[in-house]
Amino acid sequence: MTEPFLRARHRGDDEKVAEYPPLPVPLTVPVFDNHTHLEIEDGGGPDGTASLDFRQQLDRASSVGVRGVVQVGTDLETSRWSAEIAAHEPRVLAAVALHPNEAPELAQKGLLDEHLAGIAELAARPRVRAIGETGLDFFRTGEDGRDAQVRSFEAHIEIAKQHGLALQIHDRDAHRDVVRVLDRVGAPERTVFHCFSGDVEFAREVAARGWYLSFAGTVTFKNAGGLREALEAVPRAQLLIETDAPYLTPTPWRGRPNSSYLLPHTLRFMAEHLGTDASMLAAQIASNTELVYGRWEDEPVTATSPLSLEGS
């Protein structure tokens, strides 16, 4: 039976659990959340009520014009959970992968190949439409762990190409190395830089290769002028949007738990910054998203859900 959550969000000793923000004004034209983590429990109500489970979060998202989400795995367990949820929930497609920060420890234990084989098996399941999040993260990993990250990244690229799936890139402090690996191995036809964090020149380089750039709530942050310059350089046909929930909550709710239903804040901010109509931008991004992952309705869900939820 699939549980409503797999793990709680890690918080520091001095960090309190905050309540979820209120619903935004619904979008007139719906969009899709390119990247979220519904398996992570976070937040609560003003009176100490429980966190929103994934169904409640999806219901809120639907009510404000977020038609569907890509639920993203970061290890074998969360990837299995993601594939299982997608198989039974029509608003969810799955991405499966080992996060780059998982690779060094798995390699040290001699388990990397076994876990990569598990990802390859999940890639063949219905409604799994992407391999991700994979890539390189040199922020937390030292020199001794980089070879394992590169090996894992290369293997994920091959899995994506073998199954005809999109690739979701995690790139932190590793822009040049990520591009070198993609150029050397050969990027899948539909490659997405999730939570794009580069400058305007890197945005142009990524776009010139035909890859997609997905912007999260970080683009709304006061100190993110460089990221907004990058946004301006992206062709509209290569632009996606995401929450990376429960992280990176957009302004004006930064510091509170994030969820897919808050995506309208980021969409409207991006539209205003780009000097375009929010509905026109939403329509373009929705079209781009379905070009990357296909239509959410293309594969039927399983009729009987195995999900074990309180009160269901």
Which functions belong to the PLM regions below?
Residues 1-312:
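Mid-domain alpha/beta scaffold segments of enzyme catalytic cores
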